[in-house]
């Protein structure tokens, strides 16, 4: 494959990765999702008020699907976000089939309940205890929350991206295409010049002042002197 074409593929891959990233440095990427902790204490009447903090940004309350994700959230809450001791998870108790479900409609494939005992009711919520990483059951009827953890899948919905982010992504793609075209042109010119460098050999034209011509002129001059 020509070097220009290979370079173009690499640049296009980089551009795609940039566009697919989380919308800003506020968000943290892990396992194909973007996470943001909104450090705002809000008064709530029900859990939907908390969800709205996330849905307004094209995300939903956090769901957790494996031990690695749980550990990542715990570590980031402790070191970067400085979250509360008890973080409200994006789940609800469905009395129809007596199971917990995630608000983002993903499957409940993992749990880390510290205690499975107790009766689960319609107003039972799940909390992540950030000291240990275990989950606890609690009452959804809370008056306030100290921060909300939101999660969005990648690619992030572009309608929630800022105008500056869209502009930067567009410029990156345009620059990539331009570089790819220039690379192809340079490669084409290089190949054409390389082929035209092998020209056939042709003898140099005989100069009127070569040795043979000089000898003829000298003989003519000598003959003219004899006639005189």
From Swiss-Prot:
Disulphide bonds in the chain: 125-140
Domain of life: Eukaryota
Record Pfam families: Lectin_C
Glycosylated sites: 107
Any GO BP: phagocytosis
Membrane topology, record value: Single-pass type I membrane protein
Subcellular location, record wording: Membrane; Cell projection, Filopodium; Cytoplasm, Cell cortex; Cell projection, Microvillus
Annotated SMART domains: CLECT
Function, as annotated: Potential multifunctional C-type lectin receptor that may play roles in endocytosis and phagocytosis as well as in cell adhesion and migration.
Protein name: CD302 antigen
Organism whose genome encodes this protein: Mus musculus (Mouse)
Upper taxonomic lineage: Eukaryota, Metazoa, Chordata, Craniata, Vertebrata
């Amino acid at each position: 494959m020509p070097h220009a074409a290979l370079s173009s593929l690499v640049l296009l891959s980089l551009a795609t990765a940039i566009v697919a990233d989380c919308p800003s440095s506020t968000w943290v990427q892990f396992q194909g999702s973007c996470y943001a902790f909104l450090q705002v204490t809000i008064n709530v009447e029900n859990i939907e008020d908390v969800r709205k903090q996330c849905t307004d940004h094209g995300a939903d309350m956090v769901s957790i699907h494996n031990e690695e994700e749980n550990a990542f959230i715990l570590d980031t809450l402790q070191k970067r976000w400085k979250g509360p001791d008890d973080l409200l998870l994006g789940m609800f108790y469905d009395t129809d089939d007596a199971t917990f479900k995630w608000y983002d409609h993903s499957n409940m494939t993992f749990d880390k309940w510290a205690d499975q005992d107790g009766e689960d009711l319609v107003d039972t919520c799940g909390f992540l205890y950030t000291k240990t990483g275990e989950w606890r059951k609690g009452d959804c009827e809370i008056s306030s929350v100290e921060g909300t953890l939101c999660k969005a899948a990648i690619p992030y919905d572009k309608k929630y991206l800022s105008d500056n982010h869209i502009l930067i992504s567009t410029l990156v793609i345009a620059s990539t295409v331009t570089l790819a075209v220039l690379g192809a042109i340079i490669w084409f010119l290089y190949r054409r010049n390389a082929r035209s460098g092998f020209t056939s050999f042709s003898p140099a034209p005989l100069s009127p002042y070569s040795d043979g011509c000089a000898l003829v002129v000298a003989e003519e001059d000598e003959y003219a002197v004899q006639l005189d």
